[in-house]
C-alpha cells in the first residue's frame, strides 16, 4: 500500500521506467495554472508556469516580458490602455 500522504489526488502520478526494466510511480506536486491578465483574464504569454522554487531560479527576464505591465497585462489590453490614455489626455 502506498503511503497515506501520497494517496491524495492533489499529487500527480508520473510513471518512470527504471534501468532494470520495471515501472515505478513517482508522486509530484502539480503545476500551477497559467498567469492571467488582470483586465481580460487571458493566459499571459512569456510567463512561466511552475512552482515558486523553480520560477525563483530563473533570470529576471525569463520570469516576465520586458515591457510596461509585463506579467500583469496581456499585450492587447496594454495597447488598449495606452490608446485610452492618449485619447483621454487630448
UniProtKB/Swiss-Prot annotation:
Keywords: Ribonucleoprotein, Ribosomal protein. One of its GO terms (biological process) is translation. Residues 51-62 have a biased composition (Basic residues). Gene3D superfamilies: 6.20.340.10. Residues 38-65 are annotated as: Disordered. It comes from the Archaea. GO terms for cellular component: ribonucleoprotein complex; ribosome. GO terms for molecular function: structural constituent of ribosome. InterPro entries: Ribosomal_eL34 (IPR008195), Ribosomal_eL34_C_sf (IPR038562), Ribosomal_eL34_CS (IPR018065), Ribosomal_L34e_arc-type (IPR047868). HAMAP family: Ribosomal_eL34. NCBIfam families: PRK04059.1. PANTHER family: 60S RIBOSOMAL PROTEIN L34. Belongs to the eukaryotic ribosomal protein eL34 family. This is Large ribosomal subunit protein eL34.
Amino acid at each position: 500500500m502506498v503511503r497515506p500522504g501520497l494517496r491524495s489526488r492533489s499529487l500527480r502520478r508520473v510513471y518512470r521506467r527504471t534501468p532494470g526494466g520495471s515501472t515505478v510511480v513517482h508522486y509530484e506536486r502539480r503545476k500551477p495554472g497559467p498567469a492571467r491578465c488582470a483586465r481580460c483574464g487571458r493566459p499571459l504569454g512569456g510567463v512561466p508556469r511552475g512552482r515558486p522554487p523553480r520560477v525563483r531560479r530563473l533570470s529576471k527576464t525569463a520570469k516576465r516580458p520586458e515591457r510596461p505591465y509585463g506579467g500583469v497585462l496581456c499585450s492587447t489590453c496594454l495597447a488598449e490602455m495606452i490608446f485610452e490614455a492618449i485619447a483621454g489626455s487630448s
